[in-house]
């Protein structure tokens, strides 16, 4: 028995914790009778006020072997890390590298979809509504650099002066040109844009000739083969060759790996990302230690996650914890948090080339955490759901406060859909003049008392069922 479930030692290490129950130090255990000369390695962990790991070091002989720092966005998702490793400098001494290796991360909700460093960018497409990876797309940084191009507005501004010099367009004109360029690239120029060009004495073909060519980078595409939990076991090329494979134990520890092509495959158990510098698996809200089969910090949701604050599912063969919160059934088949895994789908390699054509991101990697994910459009095209943003309660200022005011919005005139006949869902863009939306919401047709508590936009199983139901009625939103 360990006090507060904090393991102080095992067969390999000694552990220390702070007053918040966070692992702060892990040191090699020297067996009794063995004479050592302070050569044990010590791992140290440092956290911010939100209990997120922000600094890690590993030392031996009081000398640093590796150091890393981690950066998070306001939602607590890790968006970057810097790693310094011990190497020999110009004088022959061993020390930490002066220049760190920097890695950036891009997200789609709680799923990590993009990893980029100075050499390559790796994108992951997941099974809809789950954390099971389906497709891996790798693009070299050199290829990404070739995709850089000027926008149509920039091209015209740089050479639009009377003497061939630069000129500055008003923001409204830049916006119109950007919209026109996107329509030309999609081969769907609207009648409104055609009329605007005609009024200027221009044609679509003339504007298209002014645009920089679009470069399609070369990519390496692989299909994931996963077990029933969503743990990757192999990467298969578009030619059907297995170019990476691995074996793991029940807790996600790597037992054997065959990697002749030196592919970087860091996905472990659902929702987990392997950090080579520390040996830990980043698991969204916490870090998982596969050697112990538990987390290094306490559960951020407290007792809602179980009596043991450090516990990973005790039956990892049947249960997962893709969010680092709790082991229990979730809304999504293989998502939510602590969901029971479902059988992965049968992959179809013939579809890979067509999907890869859609993977050019319209934003730089350092904006990926806040930009919409490009893969989401695949599933929205199939969805029968209404993606309109509706308003549950809208308000505008009153001249005076009255006892009838809503207690949540004193001094405000408050309206809801029940104040009108017929009662219906009110889009935020169609509110009465002077009112602003105080409580917006999405998916009114699935957030009913008899429906699920939450809805994922890419929950494909529910989407297809609803599509079939509505098609049989002759109705399609």
Curated annotation (Swiss-Prot):
Span list, region 4 X approximate tandem repeats: 9-264
Pfam families: RHS
Domain of life (superkingdom): Bacteria
Xref: Gene3D superfamilies: RHS repeat-associated core
Keywords linked to the UniProt accession: Repeat
Sequence repeat windows: 9-37, 38-62, 63-97, 240-264
Family: Belongs to the RHS family.
Protein name, UniProt field: Putative uncharacterized protein YbfO
């Amino acid at each position: 028995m360990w006090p507060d479930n904090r393991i102080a030692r095992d067969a390999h290490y000694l552990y220390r914790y702070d007053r918040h129950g966070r692992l702060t130090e892990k040191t090699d255990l020297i067996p009794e009778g063995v004479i050592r000369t302070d050569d044990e390695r010590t791992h140290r962990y440092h956290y911010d006020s939100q209990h997120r790991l922000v600094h890690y070091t590993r030392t031996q002989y009081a000398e640093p072997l590796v150091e890393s720092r981690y950066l998070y966005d306001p939602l607590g998702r890790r968006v970057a890390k810097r790693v310094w490793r011990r190497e020999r400098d110009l004088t022959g001494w061993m020390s930490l590298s002066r220049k760190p290796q920097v890695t950036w991360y891009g997200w789609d909700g709680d799923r990590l979809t993009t990893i980029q460093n100075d050499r390559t960018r790796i994108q992951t497409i997941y099974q809809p509504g789950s954390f099971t990876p389906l497709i891996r797309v790798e693009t070299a940084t050199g290829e990404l650099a070739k995709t850089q191009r000027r926008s149509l507005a920039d091209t015209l501004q740089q050479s639009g002066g009377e003497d061939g010099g630069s000129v500055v367009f008003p923001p409204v004109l830049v916006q119109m040109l950007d919209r026109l360029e996107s329509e030309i690239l999609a081969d769907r120029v609207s009648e409104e844009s055609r009329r605007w060009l005609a009024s200027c004495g221009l044609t679509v073909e003339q504007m298209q000739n002014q645009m920089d060519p679009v470069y399609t980078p070369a990519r390496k595409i692989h299909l994931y083969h996963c077990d029933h939990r969503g743990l990757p076991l192999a990467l298969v090329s578009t030619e059907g060759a297995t170019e990476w494979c691995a074996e793991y134990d029940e807790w996600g520890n790597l037992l054997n790996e065959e990697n002749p092509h030196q592919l970087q495959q860091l996905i472990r158990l659902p929702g987990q990302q392997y950090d080579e510098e520390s040996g830990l698996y980043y698991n969204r809200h916490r870090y998982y230690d596969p050697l112990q089969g538990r987390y290094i910090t306490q559960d951020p949701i407290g007792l809602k996650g179980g009596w043991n604050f450090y516990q990973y599912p005790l039956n990892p063969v049947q249960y997962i914890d893709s969010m680092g919160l709790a082991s229990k059934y979730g809304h999504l088949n293989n998502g939510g948090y602590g969901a029971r895994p479902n059988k992965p789908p049968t992959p179809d390699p013939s579809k890979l080339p067509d999907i890869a054509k859609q993977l050019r991101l319209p934003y730089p990697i350092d904006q990926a955490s806040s930009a919409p994910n490009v893969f989401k459009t695949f599933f929205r095209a199939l969805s029968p759901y209404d993606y309109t943003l509706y308003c549950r309660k809208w308000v505008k200022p009153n001249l005076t406060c009255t006892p009838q005011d809503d207690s949540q919005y004193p001094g405000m005139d408050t309206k809801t859909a029940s104040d009108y006949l017929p009662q219906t869902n009110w889009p935020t863009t169609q509110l009465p003049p002077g009112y602003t939306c105080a409580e917006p919401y999405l998916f009114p047709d699935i957030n009913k008392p008899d429906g699920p508590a939450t809805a994922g936009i890419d929950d494909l199983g529910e989407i297809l069922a609803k599509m079939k139901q509505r098609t049989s009625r002759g109705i399609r939103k």
